[in-house]
């Protein structure tokens, strides 16, 4: 198998193959008033039969139709009939053997993605869909990472039983904790927090949850099956292919109506297994192989997508553009972006910019891999070392600021700046100005769905709860003061815990769900995050994404565990700053420190550790005392 696979790959890499078979046209099934057209790219197939079904998962094919081979290795079937609602797959004869495949370009499918579905997408649009559009961009991109099922599964969140864990939950307005009408939950809570974007963990069709199973099934969803179809387990009916599409659109519409944008987490670096449409229709074209013909495994998931191959590159770009066009998606978070090529990422950004305007769609990802990968054609991966080769608007998660703040994510006992490792002071200073990179390149964060929650990490390194609370506030104050875009993991603001588990991708929903009662228990922390987010949006010196943004920040005091910077805030088209100059001071020492301030009078804006009965309108000059494990924000009068 390995030798045969390598021989196939080498053939695909020849100039002869590329010149003869690289194809730029549309693929998949399309239905309009003229009829139905289905196209599949498979240059090595000897024959292809289209098999049509009435059912999405059971029963024999009602019709089997030989497809016509056209130019560029494209197989086509067209008919002057609207076949919307029919399910289908392909029987391909390759090297004398018949392979059954769904459609790589499927836009709908049956339960568990076993069969593709022909669909007239216009029939899936909710009322008002044509008028749906992204809200205007604000002063800062502040991203809130969220899992569809976790969002609404808690019975105390106030959602009706029939929508808990579903797309439909996002359409339920004015939910409150325990239905008491007091503390908001759901989208109203997120809107009040002050963020600008919701990033949804994978919502394409993934293979790790049985869509025909019970409601307890849970997975993060990093197991792609059908890249261009919404996941069915979040729909009210996974068996009817049109339902998940309509309900997904209703979710997007509801989020937009709240003034929030939507970012989609996409996993174009690997698939759940090789039993999928990409492999079955075109063996080993879309996957990386080493010199011996073995599958490359830089994803630690058993396979790596070969994004350097021209038709794979086309597939990914087509997919991204499709989600924007059909579902009004506002941006993409690329999982293990380091496994994708620099060329691909720049082409994705270019395609989005040309279609929607420069920077309108937000693009960022993880600039690392899980292991070494085998790229062909001299391709370069979109890893951290190659960030300067990426389009300026493509962001990367800053593991440097993350680990400097709280400690290493893989060595749980290793502390960061806030929990005792004062040697990280220089790193914190560098992080405030994006480590010398354009701020557009940096996603500033301290926690996400991966690894321990912030609260759980601090619990490992610090025994005293009161001290942990100070550390949590200081952590948030630091990463929200860094130039770049801000990223918050859902629940971080209410001290979300997963009971010390660091990898809950397939653990019970009871552990993973958002615990909405913690918003009441820790409402002081939620209020602090709101205040911090609000101040961030007013500080144009931090929101600045220009190449000269670093000039807005100057250090006025630095010693081990102590850092004070001055921020220059200029008026922009969106914000007229109340304070044209502000001071931010971090003290990670346990002891109180006295600091000499730059000349002038300052109003205390935020003190993460207030003394009893301390007023909010304190004016200071000359010197100020800062408590241990504290951040101060001051505005110059």
Label every PLM stretch briefly.
Residues 108-156, 396-466:
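Glycine-rich phosphate/pyrophosphate-binding loop
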Residues 40, 90, 146, 190, ...:
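Conserved, mostly hydrophobic/aromatic
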Residues 34-38:
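Structural beta-strand segments of beta-rich domains
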Residues 437-602:
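Loop/helix patches that line or flank the sugar-binding groove of alpha-linked glycan CAZymes
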Residues 149-327, 337-356, 362:
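Substrate-binding/active-site clefts of carbohydrate-active enzymes
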Residues 42, 85-88, 617-637:
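C-terminal beta-strand-rich structural cap/linker in extracellular carbohydrate-active enzymes
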Residues 59, 64-65, 69, 215, ...:
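Active-site-proximal helices and loops of the catalytic beta/alpha 8
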Residues 1-33, 62, 69-172:
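The feature marks proteins involved in alpha-glucan
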């Amino acid at each position: 198998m390995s030798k045969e696979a390598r021989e196939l790959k080498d053939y695909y890499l020849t100039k002869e193959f590329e010149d003869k078979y690289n194809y730029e046209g549309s693929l998949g099934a399309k239905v309009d008033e003229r009829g139905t057209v289905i196209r599949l790219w498979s240059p090595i197939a000897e024959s292809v039969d289209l098999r049509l079904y009435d059912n999405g998962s059971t029963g024999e094919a009602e019709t089997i139709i030989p497809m016509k081979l056209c130019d560029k290795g494209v197989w086509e079937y067209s008919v002057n009939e609207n076949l919307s609602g029919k399910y289908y797959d392909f029987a391909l004869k390759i090297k004398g053997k018949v392979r059954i495949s769904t459609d790589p370009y499927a836009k709908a499918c049956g339960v568990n993605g076993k069969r593709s579905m022909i669909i007239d997408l216009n029939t899936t649009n909710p009322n008002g869909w044509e008028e749906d559009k992204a809200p205007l961009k604000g002063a800062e991109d502040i991203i809130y990472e969220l899992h569809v099922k976790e969002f609404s599964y808690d019975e105390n969140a106030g959602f009706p039983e029939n929508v808990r864990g579903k797309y439909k939950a996002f359409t339920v307005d004015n939910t409150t904790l325990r239905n008491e009408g007091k503390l908001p939950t759901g989208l109203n809570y997120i809107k009040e927090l002050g963020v600008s974007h919701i990033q949804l963990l994978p919502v394409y069709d993934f293979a790790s949850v049985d869509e025909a199973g019970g409601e307890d099934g849970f997975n993060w969803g990093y197991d792609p099956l059908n890249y261009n179809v919404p996941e069915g387990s979040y729909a009210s009916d996974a068996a009817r292919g049109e339902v998940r599409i309509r309900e997904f659109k209703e979710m997007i519409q509801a989020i937009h109506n709240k003034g929030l944008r939507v970012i989609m987490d996409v996993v174009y670096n690997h698939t759940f297994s090789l039993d999928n449409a990409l492999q079955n229709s075109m063996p080993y074209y879309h996957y990386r192989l080493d010199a011996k013909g073995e599958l490359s495994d830089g994803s630690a998931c058993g396979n790596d997508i070969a994004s350097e191959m021209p038709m794979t590159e086309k597939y990914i770009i087509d997919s991204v553009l499709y989600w924007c066009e059909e579902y009004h998606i506002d941006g993409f978070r690329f999982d293990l972006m380091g496994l994708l090529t620099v060329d691909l990422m720049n082409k994705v950004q270019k395609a989005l910019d040309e279609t929607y305007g420069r920077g309108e769609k937000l693009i960022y990802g993880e600039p690392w891999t899980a292991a070494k990968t085998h790229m062909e054609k001299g391709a370069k991966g979109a890893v951290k070392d190659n960030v300067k080769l990426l389009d300026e608007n493509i962001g990367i998660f800053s593991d440097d600021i993350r680990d400097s703040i709280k400690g290493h994510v893989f060595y749980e006992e290793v502390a960061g700046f806030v929990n005792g490792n004062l040697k990280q002071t220089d790193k914190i200073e560098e992080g405030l100005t994006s480590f010398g990179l354009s701020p557009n390149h940096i996603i500033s964060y301290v926690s996400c769905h991966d690894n321990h929650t912030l609260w759980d990490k601090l619990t490992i390194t610090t025994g005293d709860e009161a001290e942990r609370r100070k550390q949590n506030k200081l952590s948030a104050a630091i990463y929200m003061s860094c130039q770049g875009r801000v990223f918050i993991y859902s629940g971080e603001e209410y001290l979300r815990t997963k009971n010390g588990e660091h990898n809950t991708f397939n653990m019970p929903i009871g552990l993973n769900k958002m615990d909405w009662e913690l918003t009441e228990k820790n409402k002081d922390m939620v209020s602090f995050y709101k205040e911090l987010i609000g101040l961030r949006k007013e500080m144009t010196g931090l929101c600045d994404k220009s190449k000269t943004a670093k000039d807005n920040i100057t250090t006025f005091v630095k010693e081990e565990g102590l850092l004070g910077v001055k921020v220059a805030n200029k008026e922009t088209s969106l914000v007229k700053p109340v304070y044209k100059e502000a001071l931010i001071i971090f003290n990670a020492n346990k002891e109180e420190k006295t600091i000499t301030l730059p000349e002038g009078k300052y109003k205390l804006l935020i003190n993460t550790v207030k003394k009893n009965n301390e007023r909010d309108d304190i004016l200071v000059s000359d010197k100020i005392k800062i408590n241990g494990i504290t951040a101060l924000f001051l505005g110059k009068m």
